[in-house]
Amino acid sequence: MAFHFSTGRSVIGRRTFILGSSISLLGLRFPANAQSTAKLPRIGFLGATSEAGFGQHIDAFRSGLRDLGYVDGKTCIIYYRWAEDDYARLPTIAAELVALHVDVLVTHGTPGTRAAQRATSTIPIVMMTSGDAVGSGIVTSLSRPGGNITGSTFFVPEITAKRLELLKEALPTVKRVAFLVNPDNPSIRPTLKTMDSTATAQKMELQIIEARRSVEIEHAFSTMAKTGADAFVILDDRMLVDNAKEIAALAAANRLPGAGPREFADVGGLIAYAVDFSNLYRRAAVFIDKILKGTKPSDIPVEQATRFETVINLKTAKALSLTIPQSLLLRADAVIR
């Protein structure tokens, strides 16, 4: 009997030890896992518009990161925040990302970059598509940006003026051109100056038509029709780009030829001249990688956009009974037939 009792105690002791060891090991695993997650680099993404509006560009951004080994949830954590075309929300969501203690903050567009700049002077910021970063005071210079911001930039005035020139080349008789703008865009002043001089050189009259939000775009086209515009040009503004489909539809309904961003021609607009934005978003990963590996943003030169594309939509030209000069078609990077 004593032998039986003694063996029972021994068995229970072993089971207790095994069970206790398992619980102990499991308990050690969870903190280790949590700790490894906490060590993953944190990337904050500040979007001035919507994720749906970003489309292929956000895919390019993720692809660029993936090529360098950064996969959301596995080797990094990405926090996305979207202002949904409401620039007034940018300071709030920029502060929200700062409060998450991200290691690097990614912005697109000048309004988003400015909001991030005001929210933090210590967290590195990578701007993806800010217009004239030096002229707007975001960085000191392209080669030595200073502060906590680096990334890519392009010059909105020159791009928009080029659209006006292409429109004139495609439609030599055009006289009165509406310029569809978001007046809240920080690039508006220098762009208007460049557009005025370009319109004068091309012997065209320029009319400024404003739309701050997507709900104002339809009214903008009503104004174009009332003022007798022959054609229109779109400012390089994120809100307007994201609403390219509606703009193209309204242009078709009013039989107005227009020139704008790449997205505009893709969804039915006549002419597009634009920066290859997908390339810029993909390049953002290079800046992020350098910063996460210890390089200060002030020591990383700002890159200027160098890849541009001209697109002609011949389907739209046919619908508008327009004949596009062969010389322009031959120079186009893409022709939609």
Feature names for model-found ranges:
Residues M1-R337:
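Short hydrophobic alpha-helices and adjacent helix-cap/hinge residues
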